């Protein structure tokens, strides 16, 4: 019914029902019931043919105005129709599908005045775009190469204009000083401005493009002037900076990378001196600790061992290389064990201090969760009722004897259920107000159990708001019942 109501000729449904556009649905329904009783074919014997069109129009008006969405659409169309001098649609195609429906809505909502304004605004924007294109000069152009015969070649490419660094400033060219421009500021080559040829280079997108190119050139310079060998030589296997390894110069970095794995004989590995002030690391070969460990495992018993140092954040002092004296090894082992124990003691002391602070925080939070302390201070909230709210019946659309009788019987049952529901929730609302007054008198800054208080407050507030919503629904049901009674009395002349 909603489709036919909006695709026929425009009819003011407010005028048909005798209501205002600001009237509520209760007032509109009162007028509808009066008119239905007056123009019903059964109440007009002998005049059925005259009354039937008016009765159908009243029914259609009520179907549109009772639905909030349909009523909003009708109000919008009513405003559009009021603004036209003729008041009718000028474009009415055949109703052959959904496409025609869309075109009808679009064509009917655009007047001649609005179309003229749109055209003037579009022309003004085009003129501004043309002016802005003429003032923009860039350092990138789309070159189109031509052959000797004058025909354009197929290979059109986007090429960068070769200019010196002195003529480029912030990604733009100066027309007066650039070599590709003449004295009058025009280009010396057959170039096409990309701003006028493609919309991709308009506005801030083109500036971002130049900025990306500039940043990429800076990154390329950093890669060329900062070799990766310097970074790898200054870090150990765990990514921690090793102070015993010095960074080589850029000139010698390439040679060190090429000769890294050349000297891998046992003699070169065994007789490498430790990193001490007497033996600086400049004279060492560039061998990683992993390679030293792999070669040291294959050494013979007659040759001295090379101690392997685990990578740490702080480099340890070098240990003496001796196998004949077991006492020196035992002293080194005990010293390392003492260092490890001291480190563990420091960590345990720090952890105990942290645990003490954590325990103090947990004790302060435990006071809030103690049920006995909370029960002594906070008032007890009332329990929320579990009774369900009744739903009022809908008013009948057709005023027949059976529909009116069933509506009145169902409303009587609803009234009984509402009476018991309202009594229970009224008592709960009274107890809830007492609970709130007690909470208002508390010193909430020094009161434990605030989380429980917030939960109780949310639960009670939601229950009271739901009761008020059902109360408003009950009030609307009473208004509909009163309007139905008035329409029935008016139909019988009482």
From Swiss-Prot:
Residues 12-78 form the J domain. Keywords: Chaperone, Cytoplasm, Cytoskeleton, Microtubule, Nucleus. It is found in: Cytoplasm, Cytoskeleton; Nucleus. Residues 229-242, 270-287, 332-354 have a biased composition (Polar residues). Residues 243-256, 321-331 have a biased composition (Low complexity). GO terms for cellular component: cell division site; cytoplasm; cytoplasmic microtubule plus-end; equatorial microtubule organizing center; interphase microtubule organizing center; mitotic spindle pole body; nucleus; spindle pole body. Residues 229-354 are annotated as: Disordered. The keyword Ubl conjugation does not apply. SMART domains: DnaJ. Its main location: cytoplasm. The keyword Ribonucleoprotein does not apply. SUPFAM superfamilies: Chaperone J-domain (SSF46565). GO terms for biological process: chaperone cofactor-dependent protein refolding; cytoplasmic microtubule organization; equatorial microtubule organizing center disassembly; interphase microtubule organizing center assembly; protein refolding. GO terms for molecular function: Hsp70 protein binding; unfolded protein binding. Interacts iwth ssa1. Has a role in the proper organization of the interphase microtubule cytoskeleton. Required for equatorial microtubule organizing center (eMTOC) disassembly into satellites, contributing to the dynamic redistribution of MTOC components for organization of interphase microtubules. This is DnaJ-related protein rsp1.
